[in-house]
């Protein structure tokens, strides 16, 4: 069972790296090599061990992070603007936390070292 779970996590990481680094072959090859190296270093973990489940959970979290939070950018011009490659898996927030605090600036209201 754990061998199958490790294989699923491995493939999921490779897919996520392919989505995150599409078109950037150097970074994609480096990510694939890193994934392979990490899985090879944990090959000796025994099935059902706590360490194996921690490593599989970590692999799932990394795959999710790569897929949803990594965005590629290319310089669009000499003025410092970039064109971002946002794909269908990219997480898009609604900025509710920012809107809640709208108009409530705390800067300048706190006096440091005054009595």
From Swiss-Prot:
Keyword terms of this UniProt record: Chaperone, Mitochondrion, Transit peptide
Protein purpose: Assembly factor required for Rieske Fe-S protein RIP1 incorporation into the cytochrome b-c1 (CIII) complex. Functions as a chaperone, binding to this subunit within the mitochondrial matrix and stabilizing it prior to its translocation and insertion into the late CIII dimeric intermediate within the mitochondrial inner membrane. Modulates the mitochondrial matrix zinc pool.
Subunit comment: Interacts with RIP1.
GO BP annotations listed: mitochondrial respiratory chain complex III assembly
Family under the similarity heading: Belongs to the complex I LYR family. MZM1 subfamily.
Origin superkingdom: Eukaryota
Signal peptide: none
Name of the protein this chain belongs to: Mitochondrial zinc maintenance protein 1, mitochondrial
Region (Disordered): 90-115
GO molecular function, one term: protein folding chaperone
Gene it is expressed from: MZM1
Organism of provenance: Phaeosphaeria nodorum (strain SN15 / ATCC MYA-4574 / FGSC 10173)
